[in-house]
Amino acid sequence: MPNISDSFRTLAIALLFLIGLFGWLLPMTLLLAPFGKHTEALRHRLMWRACRFAARHLPGTKLEMKGEKEAEWQRPSVLVSNHQSSLDLLCLLMLSPRLVVVTNQRQWRNALYGAVIRRLNFLPIGMGFDAMQQQVGRLAKEGYSVVIFPEGTRSRNGRLGRFHQGAFALAAHLKLPLVPVVLHGTDRIFPKGSHTFRRGKIEVEIHPAWPAPDNNEAAIRETRHKMRALFMERLGQGGNGKVCYSDTNLRGYSPPEYISDTHSSSHA
């Protein structure tokens, strides 16, 4: 049962969202869209500034960044992140004005939100791997990085779901580095299925880039398992503690059975 402060906080955030979307972001994006490539960078910068402002000024929340100064956003890459809340996208889009996101079909078809993201080069997950590879490759040549949630959907209980292969296969095919971004706390502030925002702290943890895996099934699978091991360890879901993060290569990497998908709570 939400308390009064949570209800007022939710109302304040909803008003800020509506004012930002209808009063600024949507009109500016639609007005600039007819000018095509000439205003593409400006549209992305508008989204970046809006998300950066919103993430830093959410009522009742504290934002902490780790690894932001060391991040190399000028280098196109595949960002992979855990998915716990609708707030996750806000926390990722604030990182750089040169990000595009692989999003689900429901968001892509939304009359209002979809109108914005289609003009920001976001990609629908249903387009298929070959088309996705072609589009991501084109965007990478233009200096953009792509954000993918390898779980495919938000977790209902905060537990890390199984990682699907797509992000790692894309990185392998296009020879793009992988950047792990671990999100903490968004599930406690606005969990899946909730209609109210709670007080809390959000941590955005940006890790050094991993090299692209070799373009073969075994290497892609191994990178997927290693990446999930990193996220499990950083989220404190490492079970018996055999996986200890030390560097991008996960020294002391545990056997696959340790990071099996038995804790998965959601599937794409």
Question: Which residues are covered by each model-predicted region?
Answer:
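A transmembrane-helix-recognition feature enriched in membrane-embedded lipid enzymes
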Residues: P2-E64, A115-R119
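Non-catalytic C-terminal accessory region of glycerolipid acyltransferases
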Residues: I4-F8, D130-A268
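Catalytic core of membrane glycerolipid acyltransferases/transacylases, capturing the structured
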Residues: M28-R45, W73-G128
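Hydrophobic alpha-helical segments typical of transmembrane helices
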Residues: A50, D88-C91, L112, G166-A167, ...
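Structured helix-beta-strand junction loops
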Residues: T61, R98, R119-L120, E142-G143, ...
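A residue-level signal for beta-strand positions that form part of recognition/binding surfaces
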Residues: K62, P76, R98, K201-E203
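Short acidic-hydrophobic, aromatic-tinged amphipathic segments that line or gate anion-handling sites
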Residues: M65, L123-M127, A212
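Glycine-rich helix-loop-beta junction characteristic of Rossmann-like nucleotide cofactor-binding loops
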Residues: G67-E72
